[in-house]
Amino acid sequence: THFVDQVASLAFLAAHTRTLRLGTGIVILPQRNPVVLAKELASVDVLSGGRLEAGFGVGYVPDEFDAVGVPFSERGVRTTEYIDALRALWRGDLSFSGRFTSWDGVEAHPRPVSPSGPPIHVGGNSPATYRRAVLQADGWYGFATTLASTANALEAIRQNLEALDRPADRARIQMSVTPSEPVNRDLVRRYEDLGVDRLILVRDFRDTAGAPHPERATAVLSFLADTPTTLGLD
């Protein structure tokens, strides 16, 4: 895709912001080496003072999986295992035994700022994603949603909460979405009424691709600074 790498982008943002939460929406987790990714994300978390929120998804483009040598049919089970592996590395577990990744006597550094690691959000709109949100994640993220599709997703998550045993150390699932329609104050309130905790807005910066670095940085940071005022939420 035309998107720049998420971890590199977060490192840039960590250096240019002080209080902004930093997240990925989303890293295609089964395409990554979880041991390497654990170090990369923990490094961003440390450099940002604990502001990282890690967003993961399973992916949906078979050609991408062919290119990295990962069977497309394994993307779900790999995602489930890799989330467990990331948490184990961030906790400091010295061993892990899985179908796709294992280690013994390995200690990962740096450790994230929080002993429990950064919050993990899972993205997607499938029954498996809703189960994963309940059993493994701290939050769910919906991209290009409508009010109707968000209501359906939140209801599916609530049903899974009733049917499954959510780990006792997990707090309430945080609901985040990127709406597909133009955002205004009324739409914000309607998403809030549904039970959404956070709206994540998207700005396409491809129009700045040929500009000098200072101009690109200004475009990104101006968008971040102006967004609350644009929504009428300042």
Predicted feature locations:
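Active-site-adjacent structural elements that line small-molecule/cofactor binding pockets in enzymes
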Residues: 1-234
